[in-house]
Regions:
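Generic detection of long, well-ordered alpha-helical segments
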Residues: 7, 11, 42-53, 96, ...
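Acetyl-CoA-dependent GNAT
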Residues: 102-106
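A broad, structural surface signal
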Residues: 50, 54-61, 168, 172-175, ...
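Conserved N-terminal entry element of GNAT/NAT acetyltransferase domains
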Residues: 2-43
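Beta-rich nucleic-acid/ligand-interaction surfaces
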Residues: 69-82, 191-193
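Acyl-donor binding region in acyl/amide transferases
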Residues: 107-262
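A short helix-loop-beta-strand connector motif used in the catalytic cores of GNAT acetyltransferases and
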Residues: 77-87, 110, 263
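Short amphipathic alpha-helix that is part of the acyltransferase structural core
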Residues: 29-74, 85-101
Length: 263
């Protein structure tokens, strides 16, 4: 680890991790690479949570983000009604590969202060329609990560399936939470991302997926050229797939890629 990342805690003892990754927390095997998918939380697996916090901080810091703390763990990870952690674990490597944190929103809606439980409520205003008609059937997703050693640029063989493995886990959530109809969350784009590429990406999303009902609105809207007339003219009238190809080329020409959660 470089000196710039030396503030991050060392790896958690593997014996402690294995002791907490018990069969009752195993959800399924992945379709590729035969990895394991677990659901854990701070209360039933504190050592696994600590390793997740270490890997999140390492991953985000190496991408230009990070909290600057020894672990990326906040009060929503440790609260009484805490976020659960969906993780992919490689038995072959004895490593946690990737993860999401998630909260079944129906768990907190009976609390008058339910918005304090939701990470996204810090960033967005929710309409009554969204709260009443969507949240009871929604899982909030956040903190999506793939540790650096399993990203395609570092490990082409295993990295190609890292996100695919994690999405196997999302499929499992649909099975285990039968009332859920929606996944919801935010995508982080760091300030280092090329602004022209960012503006094109946001214009693309607004063009094909407008929030005409005002379900969710940002508390601090990003100031950017929403009209982005030149790019909109390029995609206007195109089918989604063709417009996406154009977007991908536009972004690549600026030495960026479309974020995996949008790809």
């Amino acid at each position: 680890m470089s000196n710039e990342l030396s503030y991050i805690i060392p790896p958690v003892d593997r014996d402690l991790l294995r002791s907490e990754l018990s069969n009752d927390k195993l959800i399924r095997k992945t379709n590729k690479l035969n990895n394991d998918i677990y659901i854990v939380n701070h209360h039933n697996s504190p050592n696994v949570m600590r390793e997740i916090g270490r890997l999140r901080e390492l991953t985000f810091a190496m991408s230009g983000g990070g909290t600057g703390n020894p672990v990326d763990i906040d009060e929503r990870d440790t609260a009484e009604i805490c976020y659960d952690q969906l993780i992919v674990y490689s038995p072959e490597d004895d490593e946690i590969v990737s993860g999401y944190r998630f909260l079944d929103c129906s768990k907190v809606l009976d609390d008058d202060r339910f918005k304090t439980h939701l990470s996204t409520a810090h960033y967005f205003n929710f309409s009554d329609h969204f709260v009443n008609e969507y949240l009871p059937y929604t899982i909030e997703l956040g903190r999506s990560w793939v540790q650096p050693a399993y990203q395609p640029s570092q490990n082409p063989r295993k990295g190609i399936f890292a996100l695919d493995n994690l999405w196997d886990g999302l499929g499992a959530l649909v099975i285990t939470h039968k009332h859920v109809e929606h996944f919801y969350g935010k995508v982080t784009m760091y300030p280092t991302y090329d602004k022209e590429a960012r503006n094109a990406l946001l214009s693309f999303m607004h063009y094909f997926f407008p929030d005409n009902d005002g379900l969710v609105t940002p508390k601090n809207p990003l100031v950017y050229n929403q009209n982005n007339a030149k790019f909109i003219r390029m995609i206007k009238g195109l089918e989604y797939k063709e417009a996406y190809k154009l977007l991908s080329r536009f972004v690549k020409a600026r030495e960026e890629t479309v974020p995996p959660l949008i790809n």
